[in-house]
């Protein structure tokens, strides 16, 4: 939030509700959290394609992509990770005002950071999806070798190895990617989203 009292929000002629009615669905943020390699981005992008094919306004905010632009100046230190989540949350909130279903795929390992995201976006527009998978399976999926480098000490502050991951306490949906196929996960997530955004 800006500390400058001379800056005030401007409300235009078109409301969020007007946009949602035109597009035939509510906007909301579906926040995918889980270890690297758990399947967050894969599921989010597959769901995005299906919803897009159904003519819905939908967009994936992917951790790697955001790090190339909006948050390219940030490190992976704890304070920088928090700022990363704060920026993403503020942008996602703007997309919600534009009647877009936002699929945010970020490790976001700390409970406090995810709570901050919920508070920025608004409790009524925020749904937490816990994409869970055993660490050893995530490591097996790691084609880039980041887990191996983290275990060798070549990468610092790597979630699950040298930095903590705090699992959600009460997620809105749990997806166990070691126990179901990608198609099953995508179907469950899509059905959950459609239930939440129907008008």
Where are the model-predicted features located?
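Small-molecule kinase domains that catalyze NTP-dependent phosphoryl transfer to phosphate-bearing small molecules
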Residues: 132-135, 140-188, 196-199
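Conserved lysine of the Walker
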Residues: 40
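ATP-dependent NMP and nucleoside kinases share a basic, alpha-helical "lid"
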Residues: 69-76, 92-150, 157
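Conserved substrate/cofactor phosphate-moiety recognition/catalytic segment
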Residues: 45-90
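Conserved beta-strand scaffold positions in the cores of enzyme catalytic domains, especially
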Residues: 60, 126-130, 172-174
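Extreme N-terminal, non-catalytic leader segments
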Residues: 1-29
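Hydrophobic anchor at the beta1->P-loop junction of P-loop NTPases
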Residues: 32
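The conserved Walker
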Residues: 36
